[in-house]
From Swiss-Prot:
GO terms for biological process: aspartyl-tRNA aminoacylation. Belongs to the class-II aminoacyl-tRNA synthetase family. Type 1 subfamily. Its main location: cytoplasm. This is Aspartate--tRNA(Asp/Asn) ligase. The keyword Transcription does not apply.
């Protein structure tokens, strides 16, 4: 080893010890006859003094000219800092190293930015020079946190007798969800592999094979439009179990959440985690991943709206749509008309709402609003009672379709929670949403699509609905929600080949297509398949949430941009003609 200690290891008890340190020059100061260098590595920072009597003039001069971010090696002796020169902000702040040997291992050019600067450049520049960005303490802490969480996960499932099995990266395209990333085959011209969107089918096959507890930290790929919390390639903790029901899976993951929170954050989580059905989540919060760190529950006032003279409310109710609202407690005087106009524009532009109606609850308990003249006192009193309105409250309403009121009020909840600081930084709220619909209707395609995936089993009591009313059929599905983000999703799987074929048919797949795409699964289900189920936990998102960050790219070492590009390597890039010829491919001009 070139070094005897890291830059964060030395303490007062090491005074007098000879040491060798290696690291990056974080900063340097020339104090006339002596050079002070703050030497940095991922463990911390140590002050190094290059000056007499330990160092000669040539060594001092060399140290004075070393560029910041250069990698150096120093040998010296640990000493107490001078009185009044200690730094309580550093764990090494009571000591310094008096250097008697100084060596530049790799000199640095002037970097476009430095790890310690407070005014960070734009994200594109940071991603282009990711090797510099990863030197920042915040980035290193995020990746260390990631490593801790993955280790915690692996340890937990090892304790529960899970077998870690690697599944293939090169598989077959089964275009049912997001677009696949395709890989051309050189030895099978005109044929393609697909990179896995998940190990779903392989892990089900493992259950049929008798591996009753499977787990894997799996790399997955989806060619979809990106957001701040999505990447084209991502990591998930994937597991499957035989002879279980949803209660077993949920209970197992409850334990993992508690273990991770305690071990990584030092927080206690009360178990079991709260649950609600999909129907309840949409009704109360307008989202299948509700943020429960704050209230602002949605209330349906359609029954009253239908009786009023306010044409917007009554017309909406008469058309079979909904009037729903939220009560922003003690906020009547916190929002000016201009601010309410901004919120109105927000729900219109982002969610397609027609407008935002509002009432202020006055000190005498009456409701005031520019539209209040369209309501008689009886109806205003009913609205206030339904909303739980009290003096000082601000009541906000959307009148629209179920979908628009859900999305609009859910988005409004989140925005208001941020503006009003309705939750604490670092707060962690975990819950389950269960009993999702099996299917949703794709109006453009004129057919059903699976809400989760085509291998999800229906609730036992809803099995007859597969034939009678598929849209009413509920799935044995469960999502883990952390702070309003989906942190994992799982289902109990279909283990009967006849039911699986029936679901394929409902999804518009004829027998030949189903056999072509999923024949191996249908065959496996005919040879003794146990009841089984599982879940996939998004590792990247878990780390983001447990680290209290907003951008998933902050917890991935080498992420892609929102255009799925790698700014550092230049991927994706063109390939030469010889490579294309080997793969029997040619390129065509992109459509504009």
């Amino acid at each position: 080893m070139l070094r005897t200690h890291t830059c964060g290891a030395l303490r007062k008890s090491d005074v007098g010890s000879p040491v060798t340190l290696c690291g990056w020059v974080d900063s340097k100061r020339d104090h006339g006859g002596a050079v002070f260098i703050d030497l940095r590595d991922r463990y911390g920072l140590t002050q190094v003094v290059i000056g007499p009597p330990e160092a000669n003039e040539a060594l001092i001069k060399q140290a004075g000219h070393v560029p910041n971010e250069s990698v150096i090696l120093i040998r010296g002796v640990v000493a107490d800092r001078l009185e009044g020169k200690t730094n309580a902000k550093l764990e090494t702040g009571e000591i310094e190293v008096r250097s008697e040997h100084f060596e530049i291992l790799s000199a640095s050019e002037t970097p476009p930015f430095t790890p310690g600067q407070s005014d960070l450049p734009g994200e594109d520049l940071r991603l282009k020079y990711r090797f510099l960005d990863l030197r920042r303490k915040e980035m290193q802490q995020a990746l260390i946190r990631r490593s801790e969480i993955i280790k915690c996960m692996r340890d937990y499932f090892a304790e529960h007798d899970f077998i870690d099995v690697e599944t293939p990266i090169l598989g077959r395209s089964t275009p049912e969800g997001a677009r696949d990333y395709l890989v051309p085959s050189r030895v099978h011209p005109s044929n393609f592999y697909a990179l896995p969107q998940s190990p779903q089918l392989y892990k089900q096959i493992l259950m049929v094979a008798g591996f009753d507890r499977y787990v894997q930290v799996a790399k997955c790929f989806r060619d979809e439009d990106l957001r701040a919390d999505r990447q084209p390639e991502f990591t998930q903790l994937d597991l499957e179990m035989s002879f279980v029901d949803s209660e077993d899976i949920i209970g197992l993951i409850d334990g993992l959440v508690a273990k991770t929170a305690k071990q990584v954050l030092g927080k206690d989580i009360t178990l079991p985690l709260p649950r609600m059905t999909y129907e309840e989540a949409m009704r109360r919060f307008g989202s299948d991943a509700p943020d429960l760190r704050f209230g602002l529950e949605i209330v349906d006032v359609t029954s009253v709206a239908a009786k009023t003279d306010f044409r917007v409310f009554r017309g909406t109710a008469d058309a079979g749509n909904f009037v729903r609202g939220i009560n922003v407690k003690d906020s009547a005087l916190k929002f000016s008309r201009r601010q309410i106009d901004e919120l109105t524009a927000f729900v219109q532009q982002d969610f397609g709402a027609k407008g935002l109606a509002w009432f202020r609850v006055e000190d005498d308990g009456t409701l005031w609003s520019p539209i209040a003249k369209n309501f008689d006192e009886e109806h205003l009193a009913e609205i206030k009672a339904l909303m739980g309105g009290e003096p000082g409250d601000l009541l906000m309403f959307l009148a629209d379709t179920w979908e628009v009121t859900c999305k609009g009020l859910s988005g409004l909840r989140k925005r208001l929670a941020v503006e009003l600081k309705l939750y604490e930084d670092g707060e962690l709220n975990c819950s389950w949403v269960t009993e999702f619909p099996m299917f949703e209707k794709d109006e453009e395609a004129g057919r059903y699509v699976a809400m989760h995936h085509p291998f999800t089993a229906p609730l036992e009591e809803d099995l007859p609905l597969l034939k009678e009313s598929p849209e009413k059929c509920r799935a044995q599905a469960y999502d883990l929600v952390i702070n309003g983000s989906e942190a994992g999703g799982g289902t109990i799987r279909i283990h009967d080949s006849k039911v699986q074929s029936q679901v394929f048919e409902l999804l518009g797949m004829d027998e030949e297509t189903a056999r072509d795409r999923f024949g191996f699964l249908l065959d496996a289900l005919r040879f003794g398949a146990p009841p089984h189920g599982g879940i996939a936990l998004g590792v990247d998102r878990w780390v983001m949430l447990f680290a209290g960050l907003e951008n998933i790219r902050e917890v991935i070492a080498f992420p892609k941009t929102q255009k799925a590009a790698d700014m550092m390597t230049g991927a994706p890039g063109e390939v030469d003609a010889d490579q294309l010829n080997e793969l029997h491919l040619r390129t065509v001009s992109a459509k504009t």
